[in-house]
Regions:
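Metal-centered catalytic cores of metalloenzymes
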Residues: 170
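Alpha/beta enzyme core
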Residues: 1-128, 135-166, 174-184
Length: 184
C-alpha cells in the first residue's frame, strides 16, 4: 500500500494502544536494488510510531518482516537484515507466513549472525522472530538452538526471541504434558 496509508495505519494503531507494530520490508524497492527507498520507509514508520508513543509517554517496538522466502539468497537475507536494523527495527522477523517459503533454519541462522554482528558493532540488542511453517516441537527446538548457539542464552527471553505461530503452542504443550491438546 501507499506509504501515507501505512503511516496513518501505524499512527492509529499506536494511538489505540498498540505496543508493537509489524511492517513488511518494501520488497519491490529492495529487490530492485533501491535500498535507500526500502530503508527510508522503515525510518518513516519508526519516526511516526515514536512520535505518537512519545506523546503518550511510552515506547512502541517495531518489527520488520523480511519475507526471507522471497529474498532467496543468504546475501540478500543478510543485506535486508542489516538494512532493517540500521533503519530502526527492534525485531527482525522471517516472514508473514503467507508466501510459499517461510521461516527456514538457514534464513534464521543468517539473520541471527547479522543480529550478533550488529550487536557487536552497536551494543543494541535486536530481537528475532521466526514465523511461518513452524508447527512442531522439533521445529521450535531447531530455532531455539540456533538462537542459543549464535546469539547466546541472554537472547532466550520474550523480549528478544519469539515464535510467530500459535499452532506450535499446541505441539509444545502436548510434548510437555504428554497428551494431545488443542488450545490454539
Amino acid at each position: 500500500s501507499f506509504l501515507e496509508v501505512k503511516l496513518k495505519e501505524c499512527e492509529l494503531a499506536v494511538e489505540q494502544g498498540a505496543d508493537e507494530v509489524d511492517i513488511v520490508l518494501a520488497l519491490n524497492a529492495f529487490l530492485a536494488g533501491d535500498y535507500e527507498a526500502a530503508a527510508d520507509e522503515i525510518r518513516q514508520v519508526r519516526s511516526c510510531i515514536d512520535a505518537v508513543a512519545a506523546r503518550q509517554g511510552r515506547e512502541v517496538h517495531l518489527k520488520v518482516i523480511l519475507e526471507t522466502g522471497l529474498l532467496r539468497t543468504p546475501e540478500a537475507i543478510a543485506n535486508a537484515s542489516f538494512l532493517a536494523m540500521e533503519a530502526g527495527a527492534d525485531f527482525i522477523k522471517t516472514s508473514t507466513g503467507k508466501v510459499d517459503v517461510n521461516a527456514t533454519p538457514a534464513a534464521a541462522y543468517v539473520m541471527c549472525e547479522c543480529i550478533a554482528k550488529y550487536y557487536a558493532a552497536t551494543g543494541k540488542k535486536i530481537g528475532f522472530k521466526p514465523a511461518g511453517g513452524i508447527s512442531t516441537a522439533a521445529d521450535a527446538l531447531c530455532y531455539y538452538s540456533i538462537v542459543s548457539t549464535v546469539l547466546g542464552k541472554e537472547w532466550l527471553n520474550k523480549d528478544l526471541f519469539r515464535f510467530g505461530v500459535s499452532r506450535v503452542a499446541n505441539s509444545l504443550l502436548a510434548a510437555v504434558e504428554q497428551v494431545t491438546v488443542s488450545y490454539f
